Every structure is written in structure tokens, then in C-alpha cells.
């Protein structure tokens, strides 16, 4: 059995390509089922999908990796060649190291950001619900969580990091002289919007509103900030009222189109509008960026802002890598032991078969009236002969070099490390 990972992220693939492989949390379970059903031998599998990465982790036959890449490409509506040119594949210790780095926030656009750990835990729960988790991936991810916890408690990897939400506020502050004078609209009601609303609320804007597909969830979030709630359907007619728009939904298609923004610009009489699209795939049509008086930023545009202070945390990164190295070694040791389980089961089955055969033979001898000492002698001799037959045959086979190697192995196994005695010519 092999552990491997297939993925693409913000460093290997552009935003629009990542958008083709973005899966909402409620899509992970059916997606994993579809993947596993497409394979002859269903591997253990987990799917992690965030705005910056989509990754599949599997434990099974490594030969399934190419099929998985083709399956994923088909799902995303692109050619395998295109996906292959932007994807990475990792096996065993490299896959484990990557999982540990992802969980610890070392592979994130925002170095040390804590949200990825929660997203990874959600992905594991979804895989469990899909019946796709097994003992190997369970070990991998439980160890990932433990390593991430140690990294965060033992290093300053998350110190002074700037989240996407905080970066949005910082950029808005560069456009507007006083954030207390602006009206802010948040589209969506998920974790990212929650964070963004928290950061903007700290600047006490003139007003805040939340537009969401379901009013109930929008109202729950709005109540914390004293914000207005509106329906997504009302967005086009009210867009012009807001100076800043922060959007992050799970929609597979843009929900703010070029036409709606053009109308808003005219109604605003060309006052600037600040827009941040934190969604993958996009919530705001990319052509909006070309409109006058519109300042649109995507998650990739925010990269240079969130990198601030990264150089100052390189010492923490080095400390984290040491912790991760130890975690990888421990996992690979466990995996190596795990790979011997089938052999151990085979050996136990074989010795049980020998034991049963010798017991049956002993019972026949007893029934014939043979002395008990003779029966026990025959029983033990039969067992030892069966156990040693393979080793003795190997010692007599092959050339001198192979016989010497076999002799040392047999000595280690049967003589508890005593060196084999050298043959003396008479």
C-alpha cells in the first residue's frame, strides 16, 4: 500500500483553473464516492478543497494515481495534459510531509493562518461520512493535527500574519481616507465573510449589510454586527449604495455581473467602489476590473499584502520544519510496520496449518497406542522440520554470495544474532 497526494494550489495554478476544481463541503462526500467507484480497488481517499487549493489524498495502489488525475480532469472539464501541467503528485514521505505542512499553515498563501486546520478537519469528517477513510489515512491526518498543534504552540509561525480578511481592510484603507465614512456590503455568510465583517466592524463603518441566499443564516451573522440583511435577488438594484463590496460564496457561477456593476457606477456618479472577490470560483465577473472607478481584487491579488512580515518569520518556519521532520519519520515508521501486517497474517496462517496437521498426526499415533514420549517427539520434530525446511533449502541454493547473505539472515532470525559458525576443513 502507498500513500499519495494529487493537487493544485495558488503556487501552481491560476485562479480560474483552481475554480474548476473547487468543491463545497457538501460536494465532497458524493465526489469521493464517484472517484472510488471509478477505480477497480477502492482506495482510502480524502478531498481537501479551499480557495487556494484542491488536493486528493489516497492510500492504496500507486498505479491509481494516473486514473485519478484523468478522472479529476474530466470532472473539471479540462484535458489531463492541462491539469498535469499545473498539478503536483507526492508519494509516501513526501505526501506525509505535505499534509503536515498544509495542516500547520506552512503551505498557505497566508503563512501560519489557522483556518486551514479547520478546513482539513472538515474534509476528514466528510471523508468519514463517505466511508472513504481507513486506518492509514486516519493515522496520517490525526498525526497532521497533532503536528499542527505542536507547531502552533512551540513556534511563532502565526505571529503577525495578515489574513485575507485583514488584507481587505488594509487595501480599503488605502482607497478611502476614513473607513468610518463608508458603507460596506458583504455577500455570503460563511467563515471568510465572518472574518471580514469582524475586521471591518473594528473600523466602525457608516453601515454594514449582508446579502445571502438564505436570510436565516444572513440574519444570524448580521445580528452580531448590527448589520442590515438583504436577499441576493436585491443585489443588482442596491449595489450602488455601497462603497465596498466583499464577496465569498460557494456559487459555481458569478453572482455579480458586469452589467450590474456598470449600472452601479453610473448611479454612483463615478465615486470609487472597492470590491474584493474572495471566492473560488469567482463571485464577480473578471471584466468588472476594467471598469473606471472600480477597484477589484481577487484572492491572488491579495497575495502581496498577506506576505508582509513573512521574512521575519523564517526562524519560526525552520523550527516548524524540525517538528514536521520528526512527524514524517514517525509516520513512515508506522507505515513500514503496517506494510508487514499481510506477511505476519500469512505466517500465522501457515504455522496454524502446520500445527493442525501435526496435532492430527499425533492423535492418530495416540489412538494406535504409541507411547506418549514417542508421540511428543514426533510432534515436535514434525513442527521444527516444517519451520526450518524453507530456511535450510535457501541455505543450499544459489551462489556463494547469496548463501552468505541467507546465512546472516537465518542467524539473525533463529540464533538471535549469533554469527554463523564458519565451516572448518578437516
Swiss-Prot record:
<keyword id="KW-0560">Oxidoreductase</keyword>
<dbReference type="InterPro" id="IPR015895">
    <property type="entry name" value="4pyrrol_synth_GluRdtase_N"/>
</dbReference>
<feature type="binding site">
    <location>
        <position position="108"/>
    </location>
    <ligand>
        <name>substrate</name>
    </ligand>
</feature>
<dbReference type="InterPro" id="IPR006151">
    <property type="entry name" value="Shikm_DH/Glu-tRNA_Rdtase"/>
</dbReference>
<dbReference type="InterPro" id="IPR036291">
    <property type="entry name" value="NAD(P)-bd_dom_sf"/>
</dbReference>
<dbReference type="GO" id="GO:0050661">
    <property type="term" value="F:NADP binding"/>
</dbReference>
<dbReference type="GO" id="GO:0008883">
    <property type="term" value="F:glutamyl-tRNA reductase activity"/>
</dbReference>
<feature type="binding site">
    <location>
        <begin position="188"/>
        <end position="193"/>
    </location>
    <ligand>
        <name>NADP(+)</name>
    </ligand>
</feature>
<feature type="binding site">
    <location>
        <begin position="113"/>
        <end position="115"/>
    </location>
    <ligand>
        <name>substrate</name>
    </ligand>
</feature>
<comment type="subunit">
    <text>Homodimer.</text>
</comment>
<feature type="site" description="Important for activity">
    <location>
        <position position="98"/>
    </location>
</feature>
<dbReference type="Pfam" id="PF00745">
    <property type="entry name" value="GlutR_dimer"/>
</dbReference>
<keyword id="KW-0521">NADP</keyword>
<dbReference type="InterPro" id="IPR018214">
    <property type="entry name" value="GluRdtase_CS"/>
</dbReference>
<dbReference type="InterPro" id="IPR036453">
    <property type="entry name" value="GluRdtase_dimer_dom_sf"/>
</dbReference>
<feature type="binding site">
    <location>
        <begin position="50"/>
        <end position="53"/>
    </location>
    <ligand>
        <name>substrate</name>
    </ligand>
</feature>
<feature type="binding site">
    <location>
        <position position="119"/>
    </location>
    <ligand>
        <name>substrate</name>
    </ligand>
</feature>
<comment type="pathway">
    <text>Porphyrin-containing compound metabolism; protoporphyrin-IX biosynthesis; 5-aminolevulinate from L-glutamyl-tRNA(Glu): step 1/2.</text>
</comment>
<dbReference type="GO" id="GO:0019353">
    <property type="term" value="P:protoporphyrinogen IX biosynthetic process from glutamate"/>
</dbReference>
<dbReference type="InterPro" id="IPR015896">
    <property type="entry name" value="4pyrrol_synth_GluRdtase_dimer"/>
</dbReference>
<dbReference type="InterPro" id="IPR036343">
    <property type="entry name" value="GluRdtase_N_sf"/>
</dbReference>
<comment type="similarity">
    <text>Belongs to the glutamyl-tRNA reductase family.</text>
</comment>
<comment type="function">
    <text>Catalyzes the NADPH-dependent reduction of glutamyl-tRNA(Glu) to glutamate 1-semialdehyde (GSA).</text>
</comment>
<dbReference type="Pfam" id="PF01488">
    <property type="entry name" value="Shikimate_DH"/>
</dbReference>
<dbReference type="InterPro" id="IPR000343">
    <property type="entry name" value="4pyrrol_synth_GluRdtase"/>
</dbReference>
<feature type="active site" description="Nucleophile">
    <location>
        <position position="51"/>
    </location>
</feature>
<protein>
    <recommendedName>
        <fullName>Glutamyl-tRNA reductase</fullName>
        <ecNumber>1.2.1.70</ecNumber>
    </recommendedName>
</protein>
<dbReference type="Pfam" id="PF05201">
    <property type="entry name" value="GlutR_N"/>
</dbReference>
<keyword id="KW-0627">Porphyrin biosynthesis</keyword>
Amino acid at each position: 500500500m502507498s500513500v499519495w497526494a494529487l493537487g493544485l494550489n495558488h503556487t501552481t495554478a491560476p485562479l480560474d483553473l483552481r475554480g474548476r476544481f473547487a468543491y463545497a463541503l457538501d460536494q465532497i462526500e458524493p465526489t469521493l464516492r464517484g472517484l472510488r467507484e471509478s477505480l477497480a480497488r477502492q482506495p482510502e481517499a480524502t478531498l481537501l478543497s479551499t480557495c487556494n487549493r484542491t488536493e486528493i489524498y489516497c492510500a492504496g495502489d500507486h498505479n491509481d494515481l494516473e486514473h485519478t488525475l484523468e478522472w479529476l480532469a474530466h470532472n473539471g472539464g479540462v484535458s489531463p495534459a492541462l491539469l498535469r501541467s499545473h498539478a503536483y503528485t507526492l508519494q509516501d514521505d513526501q505526501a506525509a510531509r505535505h499534509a503536515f505542512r498544509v495542516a500547520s499553515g506552512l503551505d498557505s498563501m497566508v503563512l501560519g493562518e489557522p483556518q486551514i486546520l479547520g478546513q482539513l478537519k472538515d474534509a476528514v469528517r466528510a471523508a468519514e461520512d463517505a466511508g472513504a477513510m481507513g486506518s492509514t489515512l486516519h493515522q496520517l491526518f490525526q498525526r497532521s493535527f497533532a503536528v499542527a498543534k505542536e507547531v502552533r504552540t512551540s513556534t511563532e509561525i502565526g505571529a503577525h500574519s495578515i489574513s485575507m480578511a485583514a488584507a481587505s481592510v488594509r487595501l480599503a484603507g488605502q482607497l478611502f481616507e476614513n473607513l468610518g465614512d463608508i458603507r460596506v456590503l458583504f455577500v455570503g455568510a460563511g467563515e471568510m465573510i465572518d472574518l471580514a465583517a469582524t475586521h471591518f466592524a473594528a473600523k466602525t463603518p457608516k453601515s454594514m449589510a449582508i446579502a445571502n441566499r438564505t436570510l436565516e443564516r444572513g440574519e444570524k451573522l448580521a445580528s452580531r454586527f448590527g448589520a442590515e440583511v438583504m436577499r441576493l435577488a436585491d443585489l443588482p438594484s442596491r449595489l450602488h449604495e455601497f462603497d465596498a463590496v466583499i464577496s465569498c460564496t460557494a456559487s459555481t457561477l458569478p453572482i455579480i455581473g458586469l452589467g450590474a456593476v456598470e449600472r452601479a457606477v453610473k448611479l454612483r456618479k463615478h465615486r470609487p467602489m472597492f470590491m474584493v472577490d474572495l471566492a473560488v470560483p469567482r463571485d464577480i465577473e473578471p471584466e468588472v476590473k476594467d471598469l473606471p472607478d472600480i477597484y477589484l481584487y481577487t484572492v491572488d491579488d491579495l497575495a502581496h499584502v498577506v506576505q508582509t512580515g513573512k521574512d521575519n518569520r523564517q526562524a519560526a518556519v525552520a523550527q516548524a520544519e524540525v517538528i514536521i521532520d520528526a512527524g514524517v519519520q514517525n509516520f513512515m515508521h508506522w507505515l513500514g510496520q503496517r506494510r508487514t501486517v499481510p506477511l505476519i497474517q500469512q505466517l500465522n496462517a501457515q504455522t496454524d496449518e502446520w500445527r493442525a496437521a501435526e496435532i492430527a498426526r499425533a492423535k492418530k499415533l495416540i489412538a494406535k497406542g504409541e507411547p506418549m514420549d514417542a508421540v511428543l517427539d514426533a510432534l515436535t520434530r514434525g513442527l521444527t522440520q516444517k519451520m526450518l525446511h524453507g530456511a535450510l533449502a535457501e541455505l543450499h541454493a544459489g551462489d556463494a554470495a547469496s548463501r552468505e547473505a541467507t546465512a546472516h539472515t537465518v542467524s539473525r532470525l533463529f540464533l538471535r544474532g549469533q554469527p554463523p559458525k564458519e565451516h572448518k576443513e578437516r
